[in-house]
Structures are given as structure tokens and as C-alpha cells.
Amino acid sequence: MRNQKIPRLRQSASAWQAGLVCFVFISFLSQALAQKVPVVEKHLDNGMTLLLVERHDEPTVAGGWVAHVGSSNEKPGMTGIAHLFEHMMFKGTPTIGTKNYQKDLEIIAAQEKVRDEMRAEERKMREMFRKGEIDDVAKPENKTPRWRELEKEFTKLIEQQRDVLVKNEFDRIYSGNGASGMNAFTSEDMTAYFCNVPANKLELWMWMESERLLHPVFREFYAERDVVFEERRMRTESTPLGKFGEEFNSMFWESHPYHWPVVGWPSDIPAISKAQADEFYGIYYSPQNITLILVGDLKPDAAETFAKKYFERIPRGKTTPPDVPTLEIKQEAEKRMNADAETNPQADILWHTVPFGHKDSYALDILGQILSTRTGRLYKGLVLGSQVATEAYADQTSQKWAGYFNCGGEAKEGRKPEEVEAGIYSEIEKLKKENVPAQELQKVKKYYF
């Protein structure tokens, strides 16, 4: 069990959007199961899975695909690489995103040559840091003279590449054909890409998505890597709540790869090479590790025909993507984190639980609903009853390899987070000693079914 008292963690915009997408998708699946909406499942010859749901409410199709790879599939020293693909997969193909593909390839090759030399200089700087000769390898004043020369060469190559690039062409093709909502997100366990297209543009979606899987070109790789690093700096490094959230997470998970942030550690992101990205892509973006999902105004047979025509062009991967071998160790002691920030006092308590699909996960979902919402026990007990909190919540989060249960609340002005903590434990003890009344349980079940 883990017990923490920390300020409430605020998610970044992209994390919130990703969470919303997941919520909408999971809500739809729950409704589909409850209403027995038929989901057609097909498997292409290359191992790719196709899920189809026919709905003729509107003349549109929500199309997406999931690569079953996230930050938990990374290795130490390469954290953030899964999230980087969320950016790189929009850079185009040999026919999308460039005016001169051959010139583009020549510039990319020249960039890699310069970067190889820069990495050699960076190894020297890390050795200088290890010996105490410099205090920070990232500071401009600590760069070696040769590294600075190479950086100038690389900047010139970037300028040359801009002359042959067609910026955001992938997005323009979609929007020019009536598509909307094109986006992507990365979590610990998956990376998803999605957009909405008019029903009569489904074949275009099939071509566009299969083309970027079959012929991806990772243009502006290092510039985009720097964008990701800046994204991390703005959302994590520059905000105390972001830093606390990262510390919170890394303390909770001791041995499992959930320990590191999805965006990656600050020293890892600048060290990711294009060669590493190419290898990662070859392993985890193979057809047998991808699921296509189409929901909307479609005919399953026609959609399957399109999928075979376009996606079966992609050869099956040579290797099976490995599972995550490291499991979370059993933790024997309570951990507590106290942090000060410019926010209302809050208490959060987390327990290690079970992963998605585990037989106990459903009972924990129900428990979360019993405790949460404005009709739940925590709100009634802590907000309306003892009035130590202005809000209170509970939730079970089941991830692919492990899960956690969270109870928390925001302290009312003049009250302490310790009082919120005590109130939460009081409600938990009641659940341990008394059965949940049938009427209360039935009300919660209706939420799901």
C-alpha cells in the first residue's frame, strides 16, 4: 500500500485530451457490450487486427489504429522514444511532405553523419561531467569547441532541408477532404492515431494510414526531438505540480517500467538517435502489433476489402514484439510524500491493485463508483458530513501490466490534508466491516450496464 499526501496533480493539455479520448472509446465499448452492438473482428494475412462497428447515425467514420507499444516497452536510457513517434508519424512519406525526395534523403544522410560526430563529442562531455570538470552537459558554455562547429554544420543542413519540405502536408490532405480531429496520444501501454473522415473518404484513410506505416520518413528528426524536450520542459520542468507528479509516479512504481514518465527523462530525450528510432519502429510498429479500429457509416465487407488492399501491402514483422518482463515487486512498507506548492491542500492515497482484464478489476471499478461522484460515500462523508473537504473522489486505474486504486480529496479552507486522509480511511473501514446495501450496489451497476 502507498499512502501519500501531495497537492493535486494537474495534467497537461495533451494528457487530458488523451484521457478524454480513452474515456470516450472505453465508454463506447461499454455501451456496445451492454447493448450487444456487433463488433466485427478480422485478421489480415500479415497479422494485423481489424475491428469494425457499423453505425449509420451520421455519414462519417471514426478511424484509428493502435500500436501496442508505450513507454513501458522502452529501455533505460531510451525513455521517451515511444512518445517521440507520436510526433514523427506525421512527418510524411516519400510522396507526402517533400518536393524532392531524393534530395531529402541526401540531406537526412548528411545530417546523420554530422550527428554521429556530435554524439562522439557528447560522450566526451559526459565523461567530463563524471569527473567533475563541468557541472551540466546541457549548458551551452560546457559544449566542446568541436561540438559547436558541428552544430553550425547541422543548422545549415536543416535550412537546406526546409527548402524541399512541404510542411504539414499530411494534415492538409486530410482537412482538404473533409476530415477532422486528426491527433495521436501515447500512454504507458499504447500509441494511438485517429481522425474522423466522411464515409465516402474511407478509402483515402486506408491509403494514408497504410502509406505512413509502410513508407514512413522521419524528417526533421532531431528538430522534432528538441520540440519534445521543450514540451517536457514547459509541462514538467517549469511547473512544480508537474515535477511533483513525476516524483509521485516514480516513487509509487519501484521496479516496473511505469516508473518513468511517458515523455521520458530529461537526459534521455536529447540522446535518442534516429538509428534507435528506426530499430524501435521495426520491432513495435509491425502489423502483428497493430489494431485498426473503424466505427461509423460503413459496410464491414467493403471496409475489410479496403483494409486488405492497402494494409496487407505491409510485410509481417520479422520478430515478435517482446513483452515487458519486469514486474512490480511486492512493497512491504508505507511510503509518504509531502510537498508544498501554490495550490489548495490535498491528500491522495494510492494502493497497488490489478491490471486490466484481471477478475478483481471489475469489483474495484464498482468500488470506485461507490466511493466517488457526488452521490458517493466520500463526497457524502467528507464534503457534506464532516465538511473537511471541498471535493473527494476515488478511482480504479487498470493498466496492461498492473493497476492502482486512488482515493483523494481537496481540503476545505482552514482544514488540513491529514483530516481528509483520516476521513478517507474512515470510509474505507466502513466498507471493510459492513456489506454494501443492495440498493446502493444496484445503482452503481446501472452506471456500467
Predicted region positions:
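Active-site recognition of the HExxH zinc-binding catalytic motif
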Residues: 79-91
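Short Gly/Ser/Thr- and charged-rich N-terminal loops/segments
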Residues: 10-18
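Bacterial N-terminal signal peptides
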Residues: 18-31
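Non-catalytic, conformational "gating/processing" segments within enzyme and secreted inhibitor domains
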Residues: 218, 225-226, 233, 245, ...
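His/Glu-based metal-binding/catalytic segments typifying zinc-dependent metallopeptidases
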Residues: 233-235, 249-250, 319-377
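M16 family metallopeptidases and their MPP-like homologs
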Residues: 53, 58-74, 80-82, 97-211, ...
